[in-house]
Each structure stands twice: as structure tokens, then as C-alpha cells.
């Protein structure tokens, strides 16, 4: 018993000594051990971003943000079309494959949305900062401002091409209302303004001649002008019979761009391990196996269905002239959807062949079949494919040819779903009741934005397009 009492006393003394030691040390360490107001010496405070010396770094960060946003949202758009299909176990990929793109709770749409919103905000912020530097005469390299405008144009037109509605005026913790689906054309107007500023800087604004920036700006401006006209057709209450795009500005820009581009030119954003979205199209396709290139394009591996069969045997879609597996599709699949590609899928933003297809469509809209064939055949020549000759026998076959060539030449570039809507095409995987069919819907403002932004659509789980 005495031993037990002694041990208790010793324990009590030890605890008292420990408490005294902690009390003695606290003033030397901090007044409150739970105080979180400790400065991180590695943090960049916003005031530092007011230094013109950081302009290049700021623009590089914007480029990384835009690229990350694309990796996070491209799969949602592609699986909702016939470009990709669900092959895994996650139900929300299946609902997209079924044509239900309008669900704001979909985990993949909701997971990608914040990256797109971040890139939109950062583009506005970066362009404004560098414009201030340029006005003050302190911007060291005007190409940085041109690049910022190009990245901004990419994210703005991506929003216009992929989303039903969006919040454009929010500023960090300051909420704002969405602009409304009927007003989404302003995203393309913003992209046109940004690419125009980039062109002005490159051509007359004191930037040393930069042919690559000029190509990018011209090609992206053509895409933006074309995209605005396409959205107006695809999202009309009733898709008009005259469902071809003929925009004078897009045609002029495409023509000018082709004078600067080689026939094989493509401007790509290629992600790295440091700028991938948490759930990204590369990982879901080439690692996890949740999604795969669509069944109209490819044949699956006979033993592993979430992989494309090896080589040309993996290509299901035939070329209408050669009658054999499309080498255009084969090249596209090799660039995006093979295990060897991994997570870092290059994403084409503009290309010479897209410029040719814009010009081809404008000629077809004008009833100029010969001019249409000239441009389409030029785009096919990029892959050394033979020209169309006697295959075009009517306006209907010409239009079907246009849809086919856009389908294979612009694969996985965020163009397909609106083409499907305007041409009346449907994915075999779409359910008859799916809102992708019924409402020609695009990606909605998703759950997280609705939950955190009181001005966003409510209730936060309600479909606004059906």
C-alpha cells in the first residue's frame, strides 16, 4: 500500500513538474498554443502581384489554370456526346452516357466546374493586372499581355461551347448571378475582344513579330465567331432547317489564319502532372478505365473492354472514300486514348484543319458545292486521304459529309455535342427520355456553385434544362 501511495505521489509530482515546464516554455513559444495567425514565409501575398516583374509568372499560372480546367471538364462533355462512352463502375459517368447532362449533382460535372470558374476569374484578374502595367509603361514584355488574352479567350469560349449558363461576374467571395442561357453569346464576344487585343499587341502594339501568337489569336478568333453562330443554331427553341454556319467574321479570320499556318498546324495545351484536375479525362480514360473512346469510333479490346483494341484493328469508323478504317480517327485515338498516352492528353485549341472546315461550311451554306469540296478535300489531304469526287450527289449528302469530317477531324476538341444537336444526330447510348435528347442541354451550373452562391439557381439539385 505504501508503495502504491508513493507511486501516486510521484505521479502527481511528475504531472505538476510537467505542467510547470509547459507554462514556463509557453511565453517563449507563443502566447496561445492554438493561435493560427502565423505567417507562412512561403505564401505570396496579393500585394506582391502588383510588381510588374511577376507578370510572366502570373501569365504562366493562368495558362496552367486554363489547362487544368480543360482536363477537368472535357470528359463530361465528351461522354455526353458519342465521342466517349462509359466502361467502368461509376454511375455518374453512366448518366452522362445516357444523355443526362443536365444533372447539377453529377460528381464529374460538379468536380470540373470549380476549375473552370477559377480559370475564368484568374483570366479576368491577370488581364486586368497586366493591362495596368502596360498602361503605366512598366510591363517588361508585352507578349505576356497577348498570352494572357489568348488564355482568357480559350476559357471564355470553352464556357460558351460547353455550358448552358455560367456566373461571370463573381469575384472571389463576392457572389453574382448567372448571366442566363439566352445571354451566353457574350462569352464568345469576350473571346473575340481578347483575341483582338492579342492581335493588336502582336501586329501594332510594340510586340516584336511573333508569328505563333498571331496564328493562335487568328485561329481562336475564328473559332469564337464561328462558335457564337453555332450555339445560336444548336440551342434555338427549334433547330432551323438552315443549320449551317456562315459568319463573315469567322470566314475572314479563318482565311487570314491559313496564310500563317502550315496545313498540319495545331495549337495545343498539354497538361503536366502539376496542372491536372483532381478527376481528369486522361486518368479516367487511360488509367482507371471508367471511360473509353465511343463505340462509333473504335473497337474495344476483346479481353479488356475499357481499352481500345491495338493498332488499326481498334478503329471501327471507316473513311467514306477509301472504305477502310479511318486513319484520321486512328491518329486522334493514338493521341488521346491509349494507355501509352497516360494522363497528359494534349488538347487542341485551334488548327489549320478547323479553319478549312469553317470555310467549307460557309461555302456549303452559300450553295457553292465546288468551293465546299475544295476546302474539305484540303482538310483531308492533311492525313493524305483521297479527295471526294462523285460521292457528293445532293445538298443532303454534302451536309452529311460536313458532319462526318467535323466528327473525325475535330475529335475530342469540344465541338461534337452541339453538332449532334443541330444535325439531329443521337448517340445510341442516349435514353429516349434523356434530357440530352429532349432539351439539347449542355453542362449546368453545378451543385457546389449553387450551394455557395446564393445568386445561383436554386434549389441546388434541380435540373434547369429538360
Go through the PLM ranges and name each one.
Residues 59, 120-123, 188, 195, ...:
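Inward-facing hydrophobic residues that define packing positions of alpha-helical scaffold repeats
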Residues 237-356, 385-386, 401, 409, ...:
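Hydrophobic-face positions in mid-chain alpha helices that act as interaction patches
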Residues 30-80, 319, 388, 428-466:
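Membrane-proximal, proline-rich intrinsically disordered regions
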Amino acid at each position: 500500500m505504501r508503495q502504491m501511495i508513493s507511486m501516486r505521489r510521484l505521479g502527481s509530482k511528475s504531472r505538476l513538474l510537467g505542467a510547470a515546464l509547459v507554462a514556463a516554455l509557453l511565453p517563449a513559444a507563443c502566447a496561445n498554443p492554438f493561435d493560427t495567425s502565423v505567417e507562412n514565409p512561403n505564401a505570396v501575398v496579393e500585394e506582391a502581384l502588383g510588381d510588374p516583374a511577376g507578370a510572366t509568372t502570373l501569365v504562366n499560372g493562368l495558362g496552367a489554370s486554363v489547362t487544368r480546367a480543360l482536363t477537368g471538364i472535357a470528359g463530361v462533355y465528351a461522354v455526353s456526346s458519342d465521342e466517349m462512352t462509359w466502361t467502368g463502375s461509376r454511375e455518374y459517368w453512366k448518366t452522362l452516357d445516357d444523355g443526362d447532362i443536365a444533372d447539377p449533382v453529377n460528381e464529374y460535372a460538379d468536380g470540373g466546374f470549380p476549375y473552370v470558374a477559377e480559370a475564368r476569374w484568374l483570366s479576368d484578374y491577370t488581364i486586368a493586372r497586366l493591362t495596368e502595367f502596360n498602361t503605366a509603361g512598366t510591363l517588361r514584355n508585352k507578349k505576356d499581355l497577348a498570352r494572357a488574352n489568348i488564355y482568357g479567350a480559350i476559357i471564355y469560349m470553352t464556357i460558351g461551347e460547353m455550358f448552358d449558363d455560367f456566373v461571370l461576374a463573381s469575384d472571389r467571395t463576392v457572389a453574382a448571378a448567372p448571366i442566363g442561357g439566352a445571354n451566353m453569346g457574350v462569352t464568345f464576344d469576350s473571346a473575340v475582344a481578347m483575341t483582338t487585343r492579342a492581335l493588336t499587341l502582336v501586329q501594332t502594339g510594340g510586340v516584336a513579330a511573333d508569328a505563333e501568337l498571331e496564328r493562335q489569336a487568328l485561329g481562336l478568333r475564328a473559332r469564337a465567331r464561328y462558335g457564337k453562330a453555332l450555339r445560336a443554331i444548336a440551342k434555338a427553341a427549334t433547330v432551323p432547317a438552315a443549320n449551317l454556319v456562315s459568319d463573315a467574321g469567322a470566314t475572314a479570320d479563318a482565311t487570314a489564319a491559313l496564310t500563317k499556318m502550315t496545313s498540319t498546324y495545331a495549337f495545343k495545351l498539354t497538361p503536366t502532372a502539376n496542372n491536372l484536375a483532381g478527376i481528369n479525362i486522361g486518368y479516367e480514360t487511360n488509367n482507371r478505365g471508367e471511360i473509353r473512346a465511343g463505340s462509333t469510333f473504335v473497337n474495344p479490346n476483346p479481353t479488356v473492354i475499357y481499352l481500345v483494341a491495338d493498332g488499326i484493328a481498334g478503329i471501327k469508323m471507316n473513311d467514306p472514300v477509301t472504305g477502310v478504317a479511318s486513319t484520321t480517327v486512328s491518329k486522334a485515338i493514338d493521341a488521346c486514348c491509349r494507355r501509352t498516352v497516360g494522363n497528359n492528353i494534349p488538347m487542341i485549341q485551334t488548327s489549320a484543319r478547323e479553319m478549312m472546315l469553317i470555310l467549307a461550311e460557309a461555302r456549303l451554306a452559300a450553295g457553292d458545292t465546288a468551293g465546299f469540296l475544295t476546302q474539305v478535300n484540303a482538310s483531308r489531304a492533311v492525313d493524305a486521304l483521297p479527295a471526294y469526287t462523285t460521292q457528293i450527289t445532293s445538298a443532303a449528302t454534302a451536309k452529311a459529309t460536313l458532319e462526318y469530317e467535323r466528327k473525325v477531324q475535330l475529335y475530342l476538341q469540344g465541338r461534337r455535342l452541339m453538332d449532334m444537336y443541330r444535325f439531329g444526330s443521337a448517340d445510341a447510348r442516349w435514353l429516349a427520355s434523356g434530357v440530352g435528347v429532349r432539351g439539347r442541354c449542355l453542362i449546368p451550373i453545378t451543385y457546389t456553385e449553387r450551394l455557395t452562391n446564393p445568386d445561383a439557381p436554386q434549389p441546388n439539385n434541380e435540373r434547369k434544362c429538360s
